[in-house]
Regions:
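Cyclic nucleotide-binding regulatory module and flanking cytosolic helices
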Residues: 1-32, 88
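Short, Lys/Arg-enriched, Trp-marked, Pro/Gly-tolerant hinge/linker segments that flank
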Residues: 140-151
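Cyclic-nucleotide recognition modules
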Residues: 73-130, 134
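Phosphate-/nucleic-acid-contacting segments
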Residues: 150-177
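Short phosphate-coordinating micro-motif centered on Lys-Gly-acidic
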Residues: 42-47
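Glycine- and acidic-residue-biased ligand/ion/polar-headgroup-sensing regions
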Residues: 39, 50-63, 79-80
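Short alpha-helix-to-loop micro-motif enriched in aromatics/charged/Gly
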Residues: 68-72
Length: 177
């Protein structure tokens, strides 16, 4: 399956809407394939997040480093997930996070301006964004609640139960963090 087919399938599945041939051509014209090597950064703290990327292959971590040099992982991302510091991407402000490839990755990336001008008007993409926004809000609430009410071991077990496919690409110490 080519890179774009993975994106089409994802958008159509989440939105419940089919993409027309013309809409697919718009995607091809504006999303750019990019390869990111293991340990290479998609985004570094202090830089403005100019792109969002759809992960076709690979995995990444979003993290910050405290004043003592300790790494704090905020998010792990796998195939068919989006990469970006969305605050930086939408507000064009310096990022507070790093996004690093944990293995060789293939992504389809696009700029904020191109999303707004060409992609957002596509009904399936807009519907997909709404579903993602809802899912992200729910996930953030669940994560906050679990950090207050569950032990690390309980949170890990819930992750294994809810997302068994998610565990494979990552070492346990990353997931535990």
């Amino acid at each position: 399956m080519d890179n774009f087919q993975a994106l089409y399938d994802y958008v159509q599945k989440l939105s419940g809407k089919m993409l027309s041939a013309e809409e697919k051509r718009v995607f091809i014209a504006h999303f750019k394939p990019k390869k990111i090597r293991k340990r290479q950064y998609f985004l570094q703290e202090g830089d403005v997040c100019k792109y969002t990327g759809f992960i076709v292959k690979g995995a990444a971590k979003t993290f910050t480093v405290d004043e003592k040099g300790h790494e704090h992982i905020l998010k792990l991302s796998i195939e068919n997930w989006w990469l970006a510091d969305f605050e930086s991407f939408y507000k064009l402000t310096p990022s507070r996070f790093n996004i690093e490839a944990l293995e060789d990755m293939e992504i389809l990336q696009i700029t904020h301006n191109l999303v707004e001008e060409f992609i957002k008007p596509i009904p399936a993409f807009s519907a997909m964004q709404n579903v993602l926004s809802q899912n992200n809000t729910i996930a953030a609430q669940k994560r906050m609640q679990s950090s207050i009410s569950q032990t690390g071991e309980e949170r890990f077990q819930e992750l294994v139960n809810d997302y068994p496919h998610f565990i494979q690409p990552f070492p346990q110490n990353l997931i535990a963090s």
